């Protein structure tokens, strides 16, 4: 947990602090077309200081059986996985009303 996050949460336990951080984020899931018509699912709006993007990207890639990466504060997954990503993020504790799928 970063120093900035602990200063925001004061003396709260790390688990509770992490949950509060998740509830305050607005996550956008969108689809981009790349070269040769390939589709890439983009997940934006996650705060790198509050969520471990590398760990989250790894979890999403394994659960979706796809390739992907994280860079520039966003996660990129190969293929169109917008609706499934939303379901997985809700299972992981992110509030459904804070996850927006851009059609």
UniProtKB/Swiss-Prot annotation:
Which top-level group of life is the source organism from?
Archaea
Q: Which InterPro entries match?
A: DENR/SUI1_TIF, SUI1, SUI1_arc, SUI1_arc_bac, SUI1_dom_sf
Q: Please verify whether the record's keywords include Protein biosynthesis.
A: yes
> Which GO terms are recorded in the biological process aspect for this UniProt protein?
formation of translation preinitiation complex; regulation of translation; translation reinitiation
Molecular function terms in GO for this entry?
Answer: mRNA binding; translation initiation factor activity
Query: To which protein family does this belong?
Result: Belongs to the SUI1 family.
The record's NCBIfam families line, in alphabetical order, gives: PRK00939.1, SUI1_rel
Q: What is this protein called?
A: Protein translation factor SUI1 homolog
Q: Which organism is it from?
A: Hyperthermus butylicus (strain DSM 5456 / JCM 9403 / PLM1-5)
The lineage, from the top, is:
Archaea, Thermoproteota, Thermoprotei, Desulfurococcales, Pyrodictiaceae
């Amino acid at each position: 947990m970063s120093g900035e996050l602990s200063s925001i949460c004061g003396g709260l336990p790390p688990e509770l602090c992490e949950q509060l951080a998740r509830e305050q984020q607005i996550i956008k899931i969108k689809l981009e077309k790349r070269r040769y018509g390939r589709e890439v699912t983009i997940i934006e709006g996650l705060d790198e200081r509050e969520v471990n993007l590398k760990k989250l990207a790894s979890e999403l890639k394994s659960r979706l059986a796809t390739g992907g990466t994280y860079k520039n504060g966003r996660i990129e997954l190969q293929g169109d996985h917008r609706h499934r990503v939303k379901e997985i993020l809700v299972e992981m504790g992110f509030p459904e009303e804070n996850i927006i799928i851009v059609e």
